[in-house]
């Protein structure tokens, strides 16, 4: 995100290209296909976030930050909303269904490096964690209005993202939703689209 944003401010295409290259093929979770860990399409219009087995606060942060990256790239002429046949939308649908309905979603166990500095977190995540459900975050209007208004997708394809957008309502901006850091992850400009 930093490289993509720095290009906007400094007008340095080389920095932007580095960020975009990492977003597509990097070796860390900054790569979209690593952040969105498992794709259930075409059976379901869902793609599981790597953080889904950890907690919903981190999952929602990922939705918000990836949305910002997609929008920054869109402003530069690169369409990451459509990347990998709308992978980001499937990730949004998955997270929104987990967080704003009582429906169940498929889950694929995520295993990560067991020897690291976060010894208190299970290295094998075997289920969607319900902690943090129903949190309001200023993240849903951006993907909903992009896919609805720019991509002309039907509400059927945006079912859960629409539910989340309606649940949050008009985005109040950073810090509006709660006093911890999650309320500041994304500033909430999506409603302005």
Annotate the PLM regions.
Residues 30-56:
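Acidic/His metal-coordination segments adjacent to aromatic residues that form catalytic metal sites
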Residues 55-62, 87:
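Secondary-structure capping and boundary motifs in well-ordered enzyme cores
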Residues 1-5:
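Short, small-residue-biased leader/transition segments that mark boundaries at the very start
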Residues 7-28, 71-89, 147-158:
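Structural helix-adjacent loops and short alpha-helical linkers that scaffold large soluble proteins
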Residues 80-193:
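CBM-like carbohydrate-recognition segments
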Residues 23-26, 59, 63:
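Alpha-helical transition-metal enzyme core signature, strongest for iron centers
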């Amino acid at each position: 995100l930093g490289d993509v944003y720095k290009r906007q401010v400094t007008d340095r295409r080389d920095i932007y290209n580095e960020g975009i290259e990492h977003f597509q093929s990097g070796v860390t979770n900054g790569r979209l296909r690593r952040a969105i860990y498992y794709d259930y399409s075409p059976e379901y219009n869902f793609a599981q976030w790597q953080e889904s087995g950890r907690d919903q606060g981190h999952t929602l942060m990922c939705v918000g930050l990836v949305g910002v990256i997609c929008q920054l790239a869109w402003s530069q002429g690169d369409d990451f909303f459509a990347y990998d046949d709308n992978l980001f939308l499937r990730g949004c649908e998955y997270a929104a269904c987990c967080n704003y309905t009582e429906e169940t979603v498929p889950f694929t166990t995520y295993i990560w490096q067991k020897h690291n500095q976060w010894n208190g977190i299970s290295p094998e995540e075997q289920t969607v964690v319900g902690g943090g459900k129903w949190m309001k975050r200023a993240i849903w209007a951006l993907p909903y209005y992009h896919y609805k208004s720019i991509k002309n997708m039907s509400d059927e394809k945006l079912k859960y993202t629409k539910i989340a957008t309606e649940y949050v309502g008009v985005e109040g901006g950073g810090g509006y939703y709660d006093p911890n850091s999650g309320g500041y992850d994304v500033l909430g400009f999506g409603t302005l689209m």
